[in-house]
């Protein structure tokens, strides 16, 4: 507790000046994520395991990473009760739910059938840690399977970041440009290269190629490459990493 207290009072450096911490975990302090994680462990995790699970008649689960979390309930009415209790508990400890991210939705192996029987559209999806989770089937369409793909919001932000880097560094030597782009592609594949997401990681590579084609042709006043000389010439000299599934979510 003494160590935590020291972290809370450590303050931050802003524009070369030291600023005292007035309240809560100081933004910009390297320890802030750790302190927030400790806080949520007691406010949310322990409470869910010790109190909520024991009071629920159906199955329930909590999946949390830092301040993002998903709660799963077998019974809808228990999910609605939990949401109300969670808002009250967070308020008690000076926290609040992000309204735009908080919702109750029908999801799981019976969701599609139940919604179809009621004349409703297919089950809703939700985003978590950069992925969109949606109700699907296995390859033979015999069994339910929760499927994932890169969320549209995260895909756009990653493409934008790649575009800004290529644009800003297009005057660098080609070898260094492609080496760095490959490093960025490798990092993207390692995170997003999971089961069911092959199409999205391949699309990321395709979009990256077109960004390179566009900005390599703006290295000088004169047009540098045609489609043929770029795709069949430059990309053969400096090949880009091909995507692959790095993590199997269902087979270990």
Question: What is each of the regions a protein language model found here?
Answer:
Residues 1-252:
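Non-catalytic terminal/accessory segments
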């Amino acid at each position: 507790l003494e160590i935590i207290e020291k972290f809370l009072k450590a303050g931050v450096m802003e524009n070369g000046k030291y600023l005292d911490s007035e309240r809560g975990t100081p933004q910009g302090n390297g320890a802030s994520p750790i302190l927030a994680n400790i806080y949520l462990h007691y406010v949310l995790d322990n409470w869910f395991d010790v109190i909520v699970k024991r009071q629920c008649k159906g199955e329930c689960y909590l999946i949390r990473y830092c301040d993002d979390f998903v709660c799963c309930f077998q019974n809808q009415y228990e999910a609605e009760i939990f949401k109300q209790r969670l808002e009250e508990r967070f308020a008690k400890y000076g926290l609040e739910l992000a309204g735009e991210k908080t919702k109750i939705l029908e999801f799981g192996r019976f969701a599609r059938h139940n919604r179809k029987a009621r004349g409703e559209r297919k089950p809703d999806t939700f985003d978590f840690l950069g992925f969109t989770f949606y109700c699907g089937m296995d390859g033979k369409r015999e069994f339910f399977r929760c499927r994932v793909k890169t969320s549209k919001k995260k895909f756009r932000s990653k493409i934008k970041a790649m575009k800004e880097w290529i644009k800003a560094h297009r005057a660098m030597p080609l070898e260094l440009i492609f080496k760095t782009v490959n490093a960025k592609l490798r990092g993207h594949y390692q995170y997003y290269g999971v089961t069911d997401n092959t199409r999205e990681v391949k699309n990321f590579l395709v979009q990256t190629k077109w960004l390179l084609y566009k900005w390599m042709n703006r290295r000088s006043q004169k047009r540098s490459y045609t489609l043929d000389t770029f795709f069949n010439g430059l990309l053969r000299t400096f090949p880009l990493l091909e995507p692959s599934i790095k993590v199997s979510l269902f087979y270990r």
